[in-house]
Amino acid sequence: MGSLLPLLGISVVSAIFFLVLQQPEQSSSAIILSLKKRHGSSSGSSGNQYSSSRPSAGFQGNRSTCSLFLGTWVRDNSYPLYKPADCPGVVEPEFDCQMYGRPDSDYLKYRWQPQNCNLPTFNGAQFLLKMKGKTIMFAGDSLGKNQWESLICLIVSSAPSTRTEMTRGLPLSTFRFLDYGITMSFYKAPFLVDIDAVQGKRVLKLDEISGNANAWHDADLLIFNTGHWWSHTGSMQGWDLIQSGNSYYQDMDRFVAMEKALRTWAYWVETHVDRSRTQVLFLSISPTHDNPSDWAASSSSGSKNCYGETEPITGTAYPVSSYTDQLRSVIVEVLHGMHNPAFLLDITLLSSLRKDGHPSVYSGLISGSQRSRPDQSADCSHWCLPGLPDTWNQLLYTLLIY
């Protein structure tokens, strides 16, 4: 598959974390172009403008100035790209917002418009041909599962005649495109490093990853993520003890712990993954929308979180919380320190504008009594499907195909 993504990563992980839309960014597509030459291969909108049709099938725009991860959301009545019924059994209840009573649908009608270029239309048949005989592995937390289910639906809905097979399990769930020999899996590993049971305690081992990584090493395309679970406390905390070296801790600075774990992951990638065969990506932090003060000027609901939000944030500033910024910075620092950096699929900024895209109380995991208390129960972390993760996968598709 070549070395496109690692080279792109060198640019992205070293970029400044831009909070203002107009600030300059090194062009990701310029690097795409230079790499295509090396391998011998031969305008942005503002505001919520209405578009009556999708961009044309291929990449359009100036590759030397295109900024895939900076841009704006534009209304597009040809969206969404699929319905859950197009991929039966794939979208789980926690992401199927329309099934569980979400009364509005405008949040489905937005398309990401990068600066100085258009994203190509997702073509499932083309993706299947490109990835024929390959194994794709998503590894991480439920945001990775969000993206995995989205990618399956994008492919199945645009190439409905292909034979498929799905098995769900813990930690591994797998979807197969039988006619193309493609295996696409999700492996649940919210911290990436191992958690072992020791004398009845869940021990998070910051220096060990082989227990999880044994499931990853044969993949041709690896997409990793971690982030949200490092902030959980109380009953939501994912460990009882943390082991670092020969020492055990009940807790430690969460950013320090995350960095240690990611350096263990990075060392594994550098020493166990054949980068001439396998491409490695890392999904940046998917932001939450639990605090309306982050977007107060454009709040449409007056609620205490994402509940009732029905449209994206407009304007030129990206409302990224300091905590999200710090989590992302840990990832950037670790990737930048790699000899051959994984490519950062940098969805943080564009996702921060989508306060309207979360399940809120319209999730199959939220009970009726919880729905009556949206200020306490709304899910403002995950994303509805169809929805925002479809754009993450359009970006992935663009990088792989173009």
Swiss-Prot record:
| More info | Contains 2 motifs that are conserved in esterases, but it is unlikely that this protein belongs to the catalytically active pectin esterases.
Record's keyword terms, sorted: Membrane, Plant defense, Signal-anchor, Transmembrane, Transmembrane helix
Question: What are the GO cellular component annotations?
Answer: endoplasmic reticulum; membrane
What is its biological role? Required for nonhost resistance (NHR) during plant-microbe interactions. Plants mutated in PMR5 are resistant to powdery mildew species. May act as a bridging protein that binds pectin and other cell wall polysaccharides. Probably involved in maintaining esterification of pectins. May be involved in the specific O-acetylation of cell wall polymers.
**What does the tissue specificity note say?**
Expressed in flowers, siliques, stems and leaves.
Q: Could you tell me which cysteines form disulfide bridges?
A: none
Biological source species: Arabidopsis thaliana
Q: Where is the protein situated, by its record's location annotation?
A: Membrane
* Residue ranges, compositional bias (Low complexity): 41-56
State whether keyword Transmembrane applies. Answer: yes
> Which PANTHER family did the record assign?
PROTEIN PMR5 (PTHR32285:SF14), PROTEIN TRICHOME BIREFRINGENCE-LIKE 9-RELATED (PTHR32285)
For the motif GDS motif, what are the positions?
140-142
Q: How does it sit in the membrane?
A: Single-pass type II membrane protein
- Which residue ranges does the UniProt annotation give for the motif DCXHWCLPGXXDXWN motif? 379-393
Name assigned to this protein: Protein PMR5
Q: Which family does it belong to?
A: Belongs to the PC-esterase family. TBL subfamily.
Q: Tell me the Gene Ontology biological-process terms attached to this UniProt entry.
A: defense response; response to fungus
Q: Where is this region: Disordered?
A: 40-60
Principal localization? membrane
One molecular function GO term is:
O-acetyltransferase activity
Q: Where are the transmembrane segments?
A: 7-23
